[in-house]
A protein has these predicted regions:
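Small-residue helix-packing motif on alpha-helices
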Residues: 34, 61, 197-205, 226, ...
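Internal alpha-helical scaffold of NAD(P)-dependent oxidoreductase catalytic cores
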Residues: 106, 110-116, 132-168, 179-220
């Protein structure tokens, strides 16, 4: 990826700003190569002070960029794409969408001309360079996919998937960050109930969750094989696990993911 490449983030809200922060933390982008665009531009003054380029003019942001990353709400994406379309150039621009629900084909229709397009679905852990980002792209070549992969590999891990799997990836990868955070919160509350201070309970829950994830990431084992290592006959761990399963722990997580996928499928249509 060229060291002079400029990125415009159209819709610099929570996820857009998380992407910007992650790219800068990677060391491969200085803030001056990233333009943040949103209507309520006054909310970006802290980022302007950090050296980011800030504007409320989407077309101007596109004209001074090489990669255009669209990160707006599904309900307004049609209008945004229509307005920036005249400034998009096939030979210069890579268009990356992190908008839930809108397909590459639909993006092409809204832009009204051929473009190299990739879809990406990161999560907010991108701000600390630990995102799980799923990517998919269209033809005529792999330039959009390659650029998306390079950008998002700087801020976590990427996984190329079929575009038809993007809604499922949204539910598990993007929404899922909240589910695991809620699990950490619940674990810390349990720690408080059995006598730990709130501060210590949260610290223990966070590091324990991190350790569990690392066991799977580094070792490549299945979760149940690691669970077997800490569940002894008549022990306290298996008692706790069985109690949580009786209360519907696994089924609640599974149902949450399926409901999120169902809702994600409706967001763009509802717009």
């Amino acid at each position: 990826m060229s060291e002079s490449m400029r990125v415009a983030i159209i819709g610099a809200g929570n996820i857009g700003l998380s992407i910007a922060k992650g790219l800068v933390q990677s060391g491969h982008f200085d803030p001056g190569r990233i333009t943040l665009a949103r209507r309520r531009v006054h909310l970006l003054e802290d980022y302007r002070a950090q050296g980011f380029r800030v504007t409320d003019d989407n077309i101007a942001a596109v004209k001074e960029s090489d990669v255009v990353l669209v990160s707006v709400e599904p309900q307004i994406v049609d209008g945004v794409l229509g307005k920036i379309a005249p400034a998009l150039d096939f030979d210069r621009h890579i268009l990356i969408s992190v908008v839930t629900g809108i397909s590459i084909r639909q993006i092409e229709e809204r832009v009204g001309k051929p473009m190299r397009i990739a879809r990406a679905m990161p999560n907010t852990a991108i701000a600390v360079r630990e995102s799980m980002t799923c990517i998919a792209s269209n033809g005529p070549d792999d330039r959009a996919l390659d650029v998306a992969r390079e950008l998002f590999n700087d801020v976590g891990k990427t996984l190329r998937i079929r575009e038809e799997d993007m809604l499922a990836a949204t539910a598990l990868g993007a929404c899922g960050i909240a589910y695991f955070l809620r699990a950490v919160r619940a674990a810390s509350q349990g720690g408080i109930e059995v006598g730990l201070s709130a501060k210590n309970a949260l610290a223990m829950a966070v590091q324990t969750a991190k350790g569990a994830a690392c066991l799977l990431s580094v070792g490549g084992a299945h979760p149940e094989s690691e669970i077997d290592k800490v569940t002894t006959p008549n022990g306290c761990t298996i008692s706790g696990l069985n109690s949580m399963e009786h209360e519907g722990f696994s089924s609640a997580m599974i149902r949450g993911i399926t409901v999120s996928a169902e809702k994600a499928a409706r967001l763009y249509r509802e717009g």
